[in-house]
């Protein structure tokens, strides 16, 4: 091997950076070489041995489509923002120096696949009563060497739901060696929902009744997320009290005026509703009655007139006979 070949080998060995780092979804990652930028002629960046881009002193070209909006590439650095599950893999930058030396920088990135989204939404609220729907959704998970499908549990110690996950229905990403939610798996199949009710003045004897947990567990691993649902109700009750306090702090005249207006509007609404419900049939009935009465009146008048004429003629004839 020539001197230059040995030199390149030594530099590749000493300057190669290989780190296996785990990131969360939406994290930002920076992969940089420590070589002076003035010594670099051009750098080729790779993702799982596929070229991402070629960076030169003048420009950078060749971004792959999935990275266009989330990546910033230069001669010395590869910066990725808003990491996704599918971004996991091996990244490598091969810098060609102006003196012919090649410097390689490599980093293995693993984006956490086990993602639990646990939320609570108030469905019904009064001064003393609160009903919350708790929803747990698994957006992604990894088998981590397990040979059995994972299972999901949502609830408290005394109240829970159970769901086995058929991994065959998930979208499997071979490069990541993990299952990710998405086509063709229905979104609603990835979640469990449970409802719980709370009374504001009930004394809490067991805090576990307020803590809801969502577990995902398999053969050799498990992880979970917790949510205090009663705290959600407490926040809503406090907001309700604040609104009532603001209303009660208004001057009495304003309250009376508001009440009067409210009563008037309610009465008008009730009257309108009554009119809408009954005015049409009542008008038709009245019209029919009026027509019948009018006809009977006319007939009666005609009968009276005829009778009067007949009586007049009879009296006249009697007078002539006499």
Curated annotation (Swiss-Prot):
Q: Any transmembrane segments, and where? A: 287-307
**A Gene Ontology cellular-component term:** host cell plasma membrane
Could you list this entry's UniProt keywords, alphabetically sorted.
Glycoprotein, Host cell membrane, Host membrane, Membrane, Signal, Transmembrane, Transmembrane helix
Q: Which GO terms describe its biological process?
A: viral process
Is-annotated flag, keyword Transcription regulation?
no
Q: Has keyword Signal? A: yes
Q: State the protein's name.
A: Protein OPG049
Source organism per UniProt: Vaccinia virus (strain Western Reserve)
* Gene, per the UniProt record: OPG049
């Amino acid at each position: 091997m020539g001197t230059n070949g040995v030199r390149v080998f030594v530099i590749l060995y000493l300057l190669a950076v290989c780190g296996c780092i785990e990131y969360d979804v939406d994290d930002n990652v920076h992969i940089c070489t420590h070589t002076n930028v003035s010594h670099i002629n051009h750098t080729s960046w790779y993702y799982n041995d596929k070229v991402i881009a070629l960076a030169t002193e003048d420009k950078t070209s060749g971004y792959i489509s999935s990275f266009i909006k989330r990546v910033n590439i230069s001669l010395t650095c590869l910066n990725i923002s808003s990491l996704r599950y599918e971004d996991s893999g091996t990244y490598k930058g091969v810098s060609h120096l102006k003196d012919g030396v090649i410097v390689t920088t490599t980093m293995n990135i693993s984006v956490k696949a086990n993602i639990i989204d646990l939320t609570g939404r108030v469905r019904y609220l009064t001064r003393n009563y609160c009903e919350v729907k708790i929803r747990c959704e698994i957006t992604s998970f990894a088998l981590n060497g397990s040979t059995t499908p994972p299972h999901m549990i949502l609830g408290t110690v005394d109240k829970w739901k159970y769901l086995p996950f058929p991994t065959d229905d998930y979208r499997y990403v071979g490069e990541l060696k993990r299952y990710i939610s998405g086509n063709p798996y229905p979104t609603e199949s990835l979640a469990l929902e449970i409802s719980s009710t709370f009374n504001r003045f009930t004394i809490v004897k067991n805090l576990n009744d307020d803590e809801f947990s969502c577990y995902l567990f398999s053969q050799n691993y498990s992880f979970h997320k917790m949510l205090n649902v009663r705290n959600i109700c407490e926040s809503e009750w406090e907001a309700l009290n604040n609104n009532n306090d603001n209303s009660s702090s208004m001057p009495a005249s304003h309250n009376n005026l508001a009440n009067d207006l409210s009563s008037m509007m309610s009465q008008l609404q009730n009257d309108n509703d009554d009119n809408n419900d009954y005015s049409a049939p009542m008008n038709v009935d009245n019209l029919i009655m009026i027509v019948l009465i009018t006809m009977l009146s006319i007939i009666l008048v005609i009968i009276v007139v005829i009778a009067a004429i007949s009586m007049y003629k009879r009296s006249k004839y009697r007078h002539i006979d006499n």
